[in-house]
Each structure stands twice: as C-alpha cells, then as structure tokens.
C-alpha cells in the first residue's frame, strides 16, 4: 500500500519496487497513479481521508511492541545516524528544545536537515517541508517566506546549508520588505560536505566540492 509517494528512485534507492504482491496506490496526482509501477488498484483521493476510512474498516488489533522496544529501536536508529553524520544530533536536539512546538520548518538540501528530519519528533502534521525527491537547492528561504506570509504571527524557520543558501540569497530582500520575523539556521561547513562524503565512501577523489 503506497500512500502519497512517487516511489521514485530516491525513495527506494533502486530502479524498481521489486514487489511480488498487489500494489495499491493512493494519491491525489493522476500521473502517480498511472506511472511505470502499474498499480493493481489506484485510488485518487487525499491520504488523510483514505487512511481515516481504512482505519474505520480495519479490525481492532494490538501491536506486540511495548514502550521499551520502541525506545530501544529509536536509540538504534539514532546511533546509526550519528555514525553516518557525526556531531549533528546533539545540535538538532538543542534547537528543537528551543523552538515553539508549532514552528513550521522549511529545510534545504544540507546535512543538518538530513539528520534533523529523521530524529526530530514533530508535534503537528504538515509542519516540516523539505524538497525530497528532486532535491532542489535553494528551496528553504523562499519556502519559509511563503510559509511565514501564509501564517502571520506564527513561528516559521528556514534551515539551509552554506551552498544551497546562495541559490536564493537575494530573497532576503523580500523577507525584509515584508517585515517578516524569520530565523534562518545556516549550516556552514565551507563545502558541499554531503557530496564529498559520498565521493569518499565510493573511493572517489573529492572534486569540485569546495
């Protein structure tokens, strides 16, 4: 059951889904429902409405996961993330503690955002916006400006890397013109660190990352 997902290569990290069962697709985009994955059952509907109806139809069941099992699994995930991108989790935790729970976040393609959006428990749905899939550099600032304009007097924040921020730096003028209170977290490691790390892990000499 695929709900609101393109099943893109960046979602699967492989070219094909590789399933051997029926595929049920639920999406509001008709192109997703008729793409190369060839769903057996396609439902064009909003995810929240469909999931709510499915939940009403499902028999009552209970998970064998208890609170300690969930906590232990979270600790395993955090340790894996810390191993891949060391030194970021603690900063993300501190930032989360400092922000109001209803803060709407717009993040760019940067290692800080990659870590934060995996370990940051959100209090409200629809409050973290990230350019997943296409991976657009420069998204965070204009996205946050739009979010802050649409939600006046409510907390909004942008997270960007030092390279991605330069793509839409000029939009700071728009934020000033609109008199927005818009904090920007700039993760500055002086390079395209994620690309450098990927090259090194693939045993490729880093090139054009600074």
Model-flagged regions — what are they?
Residues 35-41, 126-130, 167, 196-208:
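Short beta-alpha connecting loops at secondary-structure transitions
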Residues 152-174, 187:
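DG-centered beta-turn motif at the end of beta-strands
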Residues 19-109:
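Phosphate/pyrophosphate-binding active-site segments
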Residues 5-8, 110-112, 163, 189-190:
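Short glycine-rich anion-binding loops that position phosphate/pyrophosphate groups of nucleotides
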Residues 1-24, 123-153, 166-169, 201:
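Glycine-rich, anion-gripping cofactor-binding loops and their flanking helix/strand elements
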Residues 71-153:
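Active-site diphosphate/adenylate-binding microenvironment
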Residues 177-210:
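Thiamine diphosphate
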Residues 39-51, 169-189:
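A short alpha/beta connector and helix-capping loop motif
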